A protein has these predicted regions:
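Sec-dependent bacterial lipoprotein signal peptides
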Residues: 1-20
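Acidic/polar, low-complexity intrinsically disordered N-terminal segments immediately downstream
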Residues: 4, 22-118, 150-155, 164-169, ...
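Short, charged low-complexity linear motifs
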Residues: 6-9, 174-179
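Signal that preferentially marks extracellular ectodomain short beta-strand elements
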Residues: 115-154
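Extracellular recognition modules
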Residues: 159-161
């Protein structure tokens, strides 16, 4: 009788072992097998104050400051990308629908992948600290008459090493990645609005 119980127990273990080694059709396994992990994610670790201003004219902060980090999609190190472009534009209204006349979107800073030399304390990933004086923003728009209060929209573009079908570098920005990456996990809105007191 003891032999029969042992034989049944061994048979159950063998059947369970063989069935656990077979390929799974579960949705999570399909996700892991089919998801594209190429590319990188740009995270905003710190963002500017809600209101910035000009030196001598305001008590508000006089710098546009961001701390950003980049993570490779598949977790490898260092991340593979070409550069991060920081573009700005000033609007008359908070919903960024009426731009200030003569103040188009401009690239105010380009950060090459080789410039990401520091490691963030938050995630131990390559990071870069951006600090642009508000006076430099104003001088980027010579001759423009600014309203007393404007709304500065900062757009980030992450230029990848991968090429699209036309042979151009893939660029992630607020138009094609903001919705999927703006949540708390990714913390990557690609677009940031700041009130600018002129």
């Amino acid at each position: 009788m003891k032999y029969i119980y042992k034989s049944i127990l061994v048979a159950i273990v063998m059947i369970g072992g063989f069935s656990s080694c077979s390929d799974s059709n579960l949705a999570i396994d399909t996700l892991y097998d089919d998801v594209n992990t190429s590319g990188s994610i740009l995270r905003l670790l710190t963002t500017p104050e809600d209101i910035i201003g000009l030196p001598g004219q305001t008590t508000f902060v006089t710098f546009l400051d961001f701390d950003i980090e980049v993570q490779q999609g598949d977790g490898s190190f260092p991340p593979e990308f070409v550069e991060v472009r920081m573009k700005i534009q000033i609007f008359k209204d908070q919903d960024a629908s009426v731009p200030v006349e003569g103040a188009p979107q401009i690239t105010i800073k380009t950060i090459l992948s080789s410039d990401f030399t520091e490691t963030s304390e938050v995630n131990k990933l390559p990071m870069y600290q951006i600090s642009i004086p508000t006076e430099a923003i104003i001088t980027s728009y010579p001759g423009v008459q600014f309203p007393p209060v404007g709304f500065l929209v900062t757009n980030f573009e992450l230029v990848m090493t991968e090429l699209d079908a036309d042979g151009n570098n893939i660029v992630w920005d607020s138009t094609n990645a903001g919705t999927t990456l703006s949540g708390p996990y990714m913390s990557s809105p690609f677009l940031w609005k700041t009130i600018f007191k002129f």
